[in-house]
Amino acid sequence: MVAEGDPGNLVKIFHLLVLSASWGMQCWMTFVAGFVLIKGVPRHTFGLVQSKLFPYYNHIVLCCSFISLAIYAAYHPRELLSPSESVQISLFFTSLLVAALQARWFSPVTTKTMFKMHVIEREHSLGQGVGLSANKEGYQLLQEKDPKYKALRKRFMRYHGISSLCNLLCLLCNGANLVYIALLMPTL
């Protein structure tokens, strides 16, 4: 017979720490780090820093998503899930799936495309301006006269957009799961 188990205090604490650490890291990377960097360092330096941070960030989020789902699923058998528990386990699964796509596909493709763009930009003395608005005309002119660069930029924007959506979806799933956990707490 299937029965729900009591995870015990250590498992509960570990689960909450993993989920909240992942969510906090996602908030920092999404809403703080990128905006601070893009306003403070040259564009190519920003891309280089992001290319070094994102693989670690994406794989940590992936691991945290896996751990969160595994712990939750271990103590909530499918046959006994309430409607709200079904939503919660679906959020954990969605977070895991999206984190895997982000870490293993979208982010690496975005980074590879960015580095190909950097090569062409350096040939045209672009990429050393600070901020997104630095030398907009130069980038626009490059797109107009170089079809290869234009295609790379289009590919970069597509994958960067998908990558950003994956990141936001993961952040929202983890945030919603934290809300579920908070609402189930009997007291602070």
Curated annotation (Swiss-Prot):
UniProt subcellular location: Membrane
Signal sequence range: none
Record keywords, A-Z: Membrane, Transmembrane, Transmembrane helix
Transmembrane segment boundaries: 18-38, 53-73, 89-109, 168-188
InterPro entries xrefs: TMEM205, TMEM205-like
Membrane topology (UniProt): Multi-pass membrane protein
GO cellular component, one term: membrane
Principal localisation: membrane
Family annotation (PANTHER family): TRANSMEMBRANE PROTEIN 205 (PTHR46916:SF2)
Entry similarity comment: Belongs to the TMEM205 family.
Entry protein name: Transmembrane protein 205
Species for this entry: Xenopus laevis (African clawed frog)
Protein's gene: tmem205
